[in-house]
Amino acid sequence: MGSPPMVTRNISTARMLGVAASTLALATGATALPSGPAHAADTITAADQPYFAYYHLDQARAKGYTGQGVTIAILDGEVDTSAPELAGADITDKSPCTVTSSVQSKEHGTDVASVLVARDYGITPQAKLLTYRVSYTYAGDTAGADCKVADGNDKDDMPSLINTAINDGAQIISLSLTSTSSGNPSKWAIARAMTQGVIVVAGAGNQGKDQGGESYDRWSGVVGVSAIDVNGNRQDYSSWGEGVVSAAVGGPITVRNLQTQQNEQAFGTSFATPLVAGSLALARQKWPQATTNQLLQLLIHTGTNPDHTWNKYTGYGGVAPGAMVNTDPSQYPDENPLAVKEGGSSPTPDEVKQYTDGVVSPFEIAYDNSYIYRGLDENKIGDSRNPYPTHLGTSPRYHGK
């Protein structure tokens, strides 16, 4: 499974690794440059991360906004929890099967996790982070035999991992990758997230083009993220499209090369994505009584575009975590502002209702431990491909007044 990452690390020469015609790609599109002689003991600090000052995260921490009590999930490469920047972070690998990440994928997963929960410079240093390994075959990752399923979705497929993260209690899911997968299992995983109040944040990619169907941001309800710099300007490498909702600083980010132990500079929507996810986590911590829909309303109403207008390049504008923790979301309607995106999107409101009413075929649902089939198809009973409780004819759509 997998495709070229949207990650470029320039050690001696540039190496553009962008989205190709395949299933998954890391969304970083990062350009990494050596930062000079470095040693394993050279821990990365807040002073090395321009976004830390840009978002005034020192002030957020001083006021106790650290993401405490919020559970975030990332679907990415392995996270190296031995990295000194991650010392003391609450990180649990919840991968449902054996995935062995290459060094490249491990670096990417570690970098994304660090933007969230690094002790010194993470946007949410006290959040609980659940990690799920995705296998990128192009990069030399391998998925074990225990990931494979004869009839149905493999355990390391994207819809399977999204549902698994929801099963495990994730409140926010951050996806620093793109995917050309447009199948029903992904649609129903997103429908579940929308109905159960789980926010999914996805990078737009780094091909500098309209990403169209190549990012999870195309789905209804998903917070698509593009990249800006610390002057608020959109970055040329950042992709765009009708799925973009917000924007955040994509670099420069100081990251660690796990092979050389040198620090490098990197850029990409892979870093912008966890900054938006982290901002939502800070708002969730500050406003625990707000609904998920109200937090999404808060995100778009505090975006930095003039009058919070939308465009396909930065959505409603750069994320503003300070404004999000200082603006009471209870003033906004409990309605999902992303239920129908510009130009139309799926799942549609009717499709979301199909999911909540339990009439979606269980063969299209991947590892959703909350799903009950309530439709009328008797063939679903006893079928080995149906692992879900089946209560024929009990859907509320058959019993409405």
What are these regions (language model features)?
Residues 138-217, 264-267, 271:
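Substrate-binding/access-modulating region of protease and related hydrolase catalytic domains
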Residues 236, 287-400:
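C-terminal subdomain of the subtilisin-like protease fold in secreted/lumenal serine endopeptidases
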Residues 1-40:
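Secretory targeting and sorting signals
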